[in-house]
Design a protein with these regions (language model features):
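Nucleotide-activated donor-dependent transferases that construct or modify glycoconjugates
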Residues: 1-18
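Short amphipathic alpha-helix
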Residues: 19-32
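Soluble or luminal CAZymes and related metallo-dependent hydrolases
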Residues: 24, 70-84
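Short N-terminal targeting/anchoring amphipathic segment
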Residues: 82-93
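N-terminal strand-loop element at the rim of the active site
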Residues: 9-12, 29-72
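Short, flexible loop segments at the rims of nucleotide/cofactor-binding pockets, characterized by
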Residues: 18, 67-74, 91
Length: 93
Protein backbone atom coordinates (compact mmCIF):
# COMPACT_ATOMS: atom_id res chain seq x y z
CA UNK A 1 0.00 0.00 0.00
CA UNK A 2 1.00 3.61 -0.52
CA UNK A 3 0.67 5.32 2.84
CA UNK A 4 1.14 8.97 3.79
CA UNK A 5 2.09 9.57 7.41
CA UNK A 6 1.36 13.15 8.47
CA UNK A 7 3.28 14.24 11.56
CA UNK A 8 2.96 17.24 13.86
CA UNK A 9 5.69 19.81 13.26
CA UNK A 10 6.52 20.69 16.88
CA UNK A 11 9.11 17.90 17.16
CA UNK A 12 11.12 15.88 14.65
CA UNK A 13 10.25 12.25 13.96
CA UNK A 14 11.47 10.57 16.11
CA UNK A 15 11.59 13.41 18.62
CA UNK A 16 14.86 14.75 19.99
CA UNK A 17 13.06 15.96 23.12
CA UNK A 18 9.59 15.17 24.41
CA UNK A 19 7.16 14.14 21.70
CA UNK A 20 4.85 11.23 22.39
CA UNK A 21 2.86 11.62 19.18
CA UNK A 22 5.98 11.96 17.06
CA UNK A 23 7.48 8.86 18.69
CA UNK A 24 4.38 6.81 17.82
CA UNK A 25 4.43 8.19 14.26
CA UNK A 26 8.07 7.06 14.03
CA UNK A 27 7.36 3.55 15.36
CA UNK A 28 4.41 3.09 13.03
CA UNK A 29 6.22 4.51 10.00
CA UNK A 30 9.27 2.28 10.47
CA UNK A 31 7.11 -0.83 11.00
CA UNK A 32 5.10 -0.10 7.86
CA UNK A 33 8.32 0.34 5.87
CA UNK A 34 9.55 -2.96 7.34
CA UNK A 35 6.36 -4.61 6.06
CA UNK A 36 7.26 -3.38 2.55
CA UNK A 37 4.62 -0.68 2.34
CA UNK A 38 5.49 2.41 0.31
CA UNK A 39 5.45 5.05 3.07
CA UNK A 40 5.91 8.80 2.77
CA UNK A 41 6.39 10.88 5.92
CA UNK A 42 5.37 14.54 5.92
CA UNK A 43 7.38 16.08 8.77
CA UNK A 44 10.16 18.53 9.62
CA UNK A 45 13.38 18.20 7.59
CA UNK A 46 15.37 17.17 10.66
CA UNK A 47 13.32 13.97 10.94
CA UNK A 48 15.06 10.61 10.43
CA UNK A 49 13.20 7.78 8.73
CA UNK A 50 13.53 4.90 6.29
CA UNK A 51 10.40 6.18 4.56
CA UNK A 52 10.42 8.85 1.88
CA UNK A 53 10.57 12.19 3.72
CA UNK A 54 8.70 15.25 2.48
CA UNK A 55 10.17 18.11 4.52
CA UNK A 56 7.62 20.73 5.52
CA UNK A 57 9.88 23.03 7.52
CA UNK A 58 13.65 23.20 8.05
CA UNK A 59 13.63 22.08 11.69
CA UNK A 60 11.03 21.05 14.24
CA UNK A 61 9.20 24.19 15.34
CA UNK A 62 10.11 23.77 19.01
CA UNK A 63 13.82 23.53 18.11
CA UNK A 64 13.93 26.46 15.69
CA UNK A 65 16.63 29.05 16.44
CA UNK A 66 14.11 31.69 15.39
CA UNK A 67 11.10 31.80 17.71
CA UNK A 68 7.92 30.60 16.01
CA UNK A 69 5.23 33.03 17.09
CA UNK A 70 2.47 31.54 14.97
CA UNK A 71 2.69 27.99 13.65
CA UNK A 72 -0.43 28.28 11.47
CA UNK A 73 1.57 29.09 8.32
CA UNK A 74 3.66 25.94 8.79
CA UNK A 75 0.55 23.78 9.16
CA UNK A 76 -1.07 25.40 6.11
CA UNK A 77 2.08 24.45 4.18
CA UNK A 78 1.82 20.89 5.54
CA UNK A 79 -1.80 20.61 4.39
CA UNK A 80 -0.92 22.12 1.01
CA UNK A 81 1.81 19.53 0.42
CA UNK A 82 -0.44 16.66 1.49
CA UNK A 83 -3.36 17.91 -0.61
CA UNK A 84 -1.21 18.23 -3.75
CA UNK A 85 -0.05 14.60 -3.42
CA UNK A 86 -3.13 12.99 -1.85
CA UNK A 87 -4.15 11.24 -5.07
CA UNK A 88 -0.89 9.23 -4.95
CA UNK A 89 -1.80 7.43 -1.70
CA UNK A 90 -4.15 4.66 -0.63
CA UNK A 91 -4.20 5.92 2.97
CA UNK A 92 -3.59 9.32 4.58
CA UNK A 93 -2.77 8.90 8.26
Amino acid sequence: MKIAQIAPLAESVPPKLYGGTERIVSFLTEELVGMNHDVTLFASADSRTNARLVPVCEVALRLSSRPVVDSVAHYVRLLELVFKQAHEFDILH
